[in-house]
Amino acid sequence: MTTDYKSPLRVGIGGPVGSGKTALLEKLCKAMRDDYHIAVVTNDIYTKEDQRILTEAQALEPERIVGVETGGCPHTAIREDASMNLAAVENLARKFGNLDVVFVESGGDNLSATFSPELADLTIYVIDVASGEKIPRKGGPGITKSDLLVINKIDLAPMVGADLGIMASDTNRMRGQKPWAFSNLRNDVEGLEKIIGFVVEEGMLVSHSEKAVSG
């Protein structure tokens, strides 16, 4: 089936409530928007709060940020019945025609949440240090099967008594060779470069400047 628009890379960003998914998405958009054509789909159960936050933060032009009200379990909207999100991604792809990547942020969910492969080409799962040192070893598909695991809010480790060394060891044990990154996205951009590098490399993205040189 042929289309008159480019099929973008779709990157799913999941994780529990308050882990820093929206903060990560804002940083990614602001860091990548000059080099790539980007759009975003956010998910909330009863509101479009994350869409509003990203719009007010001027992460992208407002028309590039679409909010989906799932009206139910966040997991269902990204896995069992992803139709609303699939439609939102397709509408954005049709509207802009040349999108390189669409980020799909799930509503806050538990460690068992995963994206349908029909919806996401790559998945990033975000947990945070404030939830406790033991989180990585609890496992669950988000921690063990996501393409990239992000352990956010490392600046809070001393305040909550979390040992980052133990968290790193547990993460390596749970994920094997799968990549992961520590991050501090509130007051710093620690870890952001590694996350962007993962998206660009694994998603085989080509920047505007690279296209200009090769073209």
UniProtKB/Swiss-Prot annotation:
Gene Ontology biological process terms from the UniProt entry: urea catabolic process
Annotated compartments: Cytoplasm
Residues the entry annotates as binding GTP: 15-22
Keywords carried by this UniProt record: Chaperone, Cytoplasm, GTP-binding, Nickel insertion, Nucleotide-binding
Transmembrane segments: none
Entries under Gene3D superfamilies matching the protein: P-loop containing nucleotide triphosphate hydrolases
Coiled coil: none
Record-linked InterPro entries: CobW/HypB/UreG_nucleotide-bd, P-loop_NTPase, UreG
Pfam families, alphabetized: cobW
Primary role: Facilitates the functional incorporation of the urease nickel metallocenter. This process requires GTP hydrolysis, probably effectuated by UreG.
Family (UniProt): Belongs to the SIMIBI class G3E GTPase family. UreG subfamily.
Protein name (database record): Urease accessory protein UreG
Organism (species): Alcanivorax borkumensis (strain ATCC 700651 / DSM 11573 / NCIMB 13689 / SK2)
Species classification: Bacteria, Pseudomonadati, Pseudomonadota, Gammaproteobacteria, Oceanospirillales
Gene that produces this protein: ureG
